[in-house]
């Protein structure tokens, strides 16, 4: 995400216990946590060590976050630092700094074992208590929806595309003037204390591109349930100068028809000439009934039940995976509003969110 260069006007800050991982990061600022407890090493896939490291470095974390209006925390759940430190960072961001705090995390693959899955679920529950909005993406869906001939790298790029577009859609809404402008207050209205949320992205070009992209966004195979009944929806329609009012209306109608009748719907459009004939649509839906927060679209007996197959973007269309490992980041948006994005990285590959892995 750091090397892609697609998120403009931001400052990335890497956070980790592992000094070696920080050295390999291309982030503008690198923050080592838990020096006394970990001696510059990783957390050994132990969430307690990750939590202790963050607690030890509370003041340092608070210092780098101070002044931010919005904080994104991204982590791979199930390991040590990501699972243990993320809730502490979230608590600091929301309660001490007063920032709108959004977490985007991944759940481990089945092959990573029961222990990591249990640790992931426990970490997610703790994280949920300290954020305004929590978006969970199950890595297992990558295996379920990928075509047989697609490589592992292509699958990771698809997930990277989802995460990258999700973060970019929010930052673009705030920082890039569009046909329909949205500011930070609009984003905050949808995402403050929203609880569990869903994120979907879609893209298309050619005839009926708006309809196809909108349908893809609201039925993304990486989503565990539909956006039906959401009481808060934030979506961004991005395209070049040939984006028409009719296309905006078509896409908006598809997205909003599934929402709660009284939903707070915030949308904006951004002009990006680099898209050419392509339209990209990102949707974040929140404010579901409590009984839907435990994803009803997945069997309780099999939390990774294979969803209906839906075409994913071709590898050439997704955001490039950075060449170098990116342990973590914090994003500060330039201009009137400052937005921090923290991605907590850990010491081994399986701890790194699938969308951030670069070596397999």
Question: What do the PLM-derived regions correspond to, one by one?
Answer:
Residues 1-360:
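Tubulin/FtsZ superfamily GTPase core signature
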């Amino acid at each position: 995400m750091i090397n892609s260069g697609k998120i403009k006007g931001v400052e990335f800050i890497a956070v980790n216990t592992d000094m070696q991982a920080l050295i390999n990061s291309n982030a503008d600022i690198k923050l080592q946590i838990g020096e006394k407890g970990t001696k510059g090493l990783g957390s050994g896939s132990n969430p307690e060590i990750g939590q202790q490291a963050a607690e030890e470095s509370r003041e340092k974390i608070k210092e780098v976050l101070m002044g931010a209006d919005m904080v994104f925390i991204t982590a791979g759940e199930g390991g040590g630092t990501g699972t243990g430190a993320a809730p502490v960072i979230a608590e600091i961001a929301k309660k001490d700094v007063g920032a709108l705090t959004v977490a985007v995390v991944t759940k481990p693959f089945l092959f990573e074992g029961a222990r990591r899955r249990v640790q992931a679920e426990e970490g997610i529950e703790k994280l949920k208590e300290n954020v305004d909005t929590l978006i969970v993406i199950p890595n297992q869906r990558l295996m379920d929806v990928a075509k047989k001939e697609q490589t592992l790298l292509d699958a990771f790029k698809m997930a990277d595309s989802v995460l990258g577009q999700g973060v970019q859609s929010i930052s673009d809404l705030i920082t890039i003037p569009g046909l329909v402008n949205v500011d930070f207050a609009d984003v905050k209205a949808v995402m403050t204390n929203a609880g569990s949320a869903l994120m979907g992205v879609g893209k298309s070009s050619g005839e009926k591109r708006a309809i196809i992209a909108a349908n893809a966004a609201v039925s993304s195979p990486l989503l565990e349930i539909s956006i039906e009944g959401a009481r808060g929806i934030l979506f961004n329609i991005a395209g070049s100068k040939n984006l028409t009012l009719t296309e905006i209306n078509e896409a908006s109608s598809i997205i909003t028809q599934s929402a709660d009748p009284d939903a707070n719907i915030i949308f904006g459009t951004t002009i990006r000439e680099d898209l050419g004939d392509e339209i990209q649509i990102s949707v974040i839906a929140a404010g579901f009934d409590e009984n839907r927060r435990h994803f009803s679209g997945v069997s309780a007996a099999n939390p990774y039940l294979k969803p209906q197959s839906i075409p994913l973007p071709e590898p050439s269309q997704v955001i490039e995976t950075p060449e170098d490992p990116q342990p973590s980041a914090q994003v500060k948006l330039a201009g009137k509003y400052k937005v921090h994005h923290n991605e907590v990285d850990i010491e081994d590959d399986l701890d790194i969110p699938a969308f951030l892995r670069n070596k397999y």
